UniProtKB/Swiss-Prot annotation:
The lineage of its organism: Bacteria, Pseudomonadati, Pseudomonadota, Acidithiobacillia, Acidithiobacillales. The gene is glyA. SUPFAM superfamilies: PLP-dependent transferases. This is Serine hydroxymethyltransferase. Homodimer. Its main location: cytoplasm. GO terms for biological process: glycine biosynthetic process from serine; tetrahydrofolate interconversion. It catalyses: (6R)-5,10-methylene-5,6,7,8-tetrahydrofolate + glycine + H2O = (6S)-5,6,7,8-tetrahydrofolate + L-serine. Its cofactor is pyridoxal 5'-phosphate. Belongs to the SHMT family. GO terms for molecular function: glycine hydroxymethyltransferase activity; pyridoxal phosphate binding. GO terms for cellular component: cytosol. Coiled coil: none annotated.
């Protein structure tokens, strides 16, 4: 029998100390990693609920375990809300992550050795879109497309020519570091012209799509995957949307193909997040996310740090640091100043991936805590001050104190 009163702090003080310090870090640091956000207390309550105890292999109404009548309700709510949010024909909410969602889609209609065509990781794509170090790049032949050197944007005419030449069985659209609107309608036309499937990974922009602030890929794609955190602001997890004709294949690939029991506590948290995303204020939040990213990009450009492609249409942008400082050095210096970013390769980067010539900046988390235009100006100048003097301890300490004071004005959880 376990204790009903013993706390983690009492039982495992070393772990509790790490948890406590991480909570403090989240409160005291400005979070600008584009893939991170703060889940609401309701999402975290669902994820920390008794649903974590329940095994439920199968799908609602078709389980391999008894006692699933209540978790069936939770999963059905998540599915129904996902369909309402995105207007899709079928939703699978069991994928443990976006990576597993992508893997399930690949294996549902492709065979090892088939060719896929995805955006190059070096140009803003994602590991799971065919990178050599990922299973997607090991199981399948890969033809990678990228952006134009002159403006950092996808060249759709070149993509069409490449697709005609390479004849992939599936085209993968979506990115992890691309700041412009993606023309899913055009990519859908390209895929159909060669008889290829279209998978859109909208993990980064799902919140924008849900609120109509980015064109939806759903009408144009055979499959759409996403994570449920990032701009959706839910728990860490995955979601697959697809046409009804692929529903059975996708479901079978998730279970029993790739996974066993679903994480019912996470699925419940997804249901909460989807309900939050259906509220009118969620669109206002997403509008502010975009406005903050555009404001921050302009402030930094005014200080001599231009964004790849010249700006942003969404929640993120890449700074090309050129010869001033490496991405690794910038990440470390900004971290010391209580500003969290990640080093990131820029298109046609001459530096290795562990060093890079750029950093990726995103505004979902900062916007969640209440930052607006005024805070973006203050933040942008702080970032530029550090980048201008990345080895100056006095500058870093001054910016750190300012960022900590700013964070205290806008607490995340209180």
């Amino acid at each position: 029998m376990f204790s009903k009163t013993l706390t983690i702090a009492d039982f495992d003080p070393v772990l509790w100390d790490a948890m406590r310090k991480e909570a403090r870090r989240q409160e005291d640091h400005v979070e600008l990693i584009a893939s991170e956000n703060y889940a609401s207390p309701m999402v975290m309550a669902a994820q920390g609920s008794v649903l974590t105890n329940k095994y439920a292999e199968g799908y609602p109404g078709k389980r391999y375990y008894g006692g699933c009548e209540y978790v069936d309700i939770a999963e059905q709510l998540a599915m129904d809300r996902a369909l309402e949010l995105f207007g899709a024909e079928h939703a699978n909410v069991q994928a443990h992550s976006g990576s597993q969602a992508n893997q399930a889609v690949y294996l549902s209609v492709l065979q090892p050795g088939d060719k896929i065509m995805g955006m190059s990781l070096a140009h803003g794509g994602h590991l799971t879109h065919g990178a050599k170090v990922n299973v997607s790049g090991k199981l399948f032949q890969v033809a990678a497309y990228g952006v134009r050197a002159e403006d950092g944007r996808i060249d759709y005419d070149a993509m069409a020519e490449q697709a005609e030449r390479e004849r992939p069985k599936m085209i993968v659209a979506g990115a992890s570091a691309y700041s412009r609107v993606i023309d899913f309608a055009r990519i859908g036309e390209i895929a159909r012209s060669i008889g290829a499937y279209l998978l859109v990974d909208m993990a980064h922009i799902a919140g924008l799509v849900a609120t109509g602030l980015h064109p939806s890929p759903v009408p144009h794609a055979d499959f759409v995957t996403t994570t449920t955190h990032k701009t959706l602001r839910g728990p860490r997890g995955g979601l697959i949307l697809c046409r009804e004709q692929y529903a059975k294949k996708v479901n079978s690939l998730i279970f029993p193909g790739l996974q066993g029991g679903p994480l019912m506590h996470v699925i419940a948290a997804k249901a909460v997040a989807f309900r939050e995303a259906l509220q009118p204020e969620f669109k206002s939040y997403q509008q502010q996310v975009i406005h903050n990213a555009q404001t921050l990009s302009k402030v930094l450009a005014g200080r001599g740090y231009g964004a790849v492609s010249g700006g942003t249409d969404n929640h993120l942008f890449l700074l090309n640091l050129g010869e001033k400082v490496t991405g690794k050095e910038a990440e470390e210096a900004l971290g010391q100043a209580n500003i969290t970013v990640n080093k990131n390769a820029v298109p046609f980067d001459i530096r290795p991936p562990a060093v890079t010539s750029g950093i990726r900046i995103g505004t979902p988390a900062a916007t969640t805590r209440g930052f607006g235009e005024a805070e973006m100006h203050r933040l942008g100048n702080g970032i530029a001050d550090v980048l201008d003097a990345s080895s100056d301890a006095a500058v870093i300490e001054r910016v750190r104190a300012d960022m900590k004071a700013l964070c205290h004005q806008f607490p995340v959880y209180g």
